[in-house]
Amino acid sequence: MKKHIAAGWRYVRYGRIVLGWIVMSTFLLGFLGVVNASALARWQLLPALLAGNVLAVTVLVLLTLCFGRVYCSVLCPLGLWQDFVSYLAERRKGGRRRYAYRQESWKLRYGVLAVLASGLLGGAAAIPLLLDPYTIFGRIATHLFAPAIHSGANQLIRWQIAYDGPDLGLAHTDVVTFGTTAVLVAAAYLIVISLVAWRYGRLYCQAFCPVGTLLGTVSRHAVLQLHFGTDCISCGLCAKSCPSSCIDVPHHRIDASRCIDCFTCVSVCPKGALAFGRPSKETITTSNAGSTQNLPNASRQPGESDNPNQPNAAPSLTRRQMIAGSALATLAAAGALTKGARGTALAAAPEKVVRPPGALSYATFSERCTGCHLCVASCPQGILRPANLEYGLGGIFQPRLDFTDGYCDPACTRCSDICPAGAITPVAPEKKKTLKIGTALYRPDTCVILTEGRTCGHCAEVCPIHAIEMADDGNGHLLPKVHHRRCIGYGSCEYHCPAQPKAIRVAGKEEQTIVQTNGQFGRGKK
């Protein structure tokens, strides 16, 4: 009977793994530009909080209250990546389990959460940019995985052509990189998190991830939890298989705030002594207070192991610590919600930086954007770039428009359609054609008409809004004249300008507004 129970939980575990692979693959394909992963991205906790996505936040909290940290188990792409690395490590070690119980790093966990809360409440946009797990995975996928996969696919196409191989159904894709800084930072995150996962499993999730701590605080009160039964023989297989290192076998205690419901422990238990359900009051007391009731050598002192080689387990959190942690988690969540709602920033918009169409207010954009780079990876024109210090230190890695290699198509609304945090609000195609995101500024000192005596007028020819005309300067030269009120700033003029440095450049606006085009909209020349 016990073997049947273990086998049943093994299928549950496999189902969790399959679902996790589907989620991570969908995210990866989304950052590759193959599928639209925006619907799934909107269920990521911190972006949902910043966007004021009440439905997503409510569902995630209720799921956690009912079942524990299932979000971390099947919805968080960074957590799923750590599971993959842990699996590779186990195969490398011949399938040998290598985990051991670790005491909760309460001060570290809630210290990181306090940093996030202070950043959200204080307007320090760089804090969520650096700490959100979904955002970290997004940058890794955009700047490391996507270029590597595209390069590999292009190489397969070259081999197919060279050796007259079968048609693989692949199309050549330009490999786009978005700057050395973004690549190096993404690589640093990938290396550190992967090394930690290789050796310690989900240690990052249990000690450093603020989303994990936030949900872990809720998970302490989950209705259904993993708990010990009366048939435990203290073999320790469950603790050795737990990637969260949250199972204290000598004290028959499972830390619900760190358990991610992977169900590995239940599937390996030879006696079926672990159960997932509503624990009894006695079990809750044992879990929360470190009681030795129903344990071997029940006369020992709390926190003392019957194995002399086993370090003494730390007592569980005091009531005061639990209240303080819950208050801090509530403060962080409230900070994210109010930050996304109020749309105020500490500084004015940086001059000349052009934001994506739909980032109507610089204040709202800077406070909601987590820099996940889903828009950067999905831009068909490839003109969205992660900022370095163009927005200041607080806006590092937030997207900006760069017209060096292209211009913004007035008919394209991809970035506003997929933003999960509400930093780029949805813009209808017809509305976008009149949405002013910047203004073209003409610099005659670098214009080839004056510096080289050439006949030019590319900027006027390609302007889709006909906001540039060629006018006589009184000296026999036809020079560009920009009608600033009509210009919408989509960069076609800057991209096509032959001068170096550019004689016409687009400067961004603090507030994106609708302009009157008088029905003169046209695509202009390519």
Model regions: which residues?
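Non-ligating segments of multi-cofactor redox enzymes
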Residues: 1-252, 257-258, 263-526
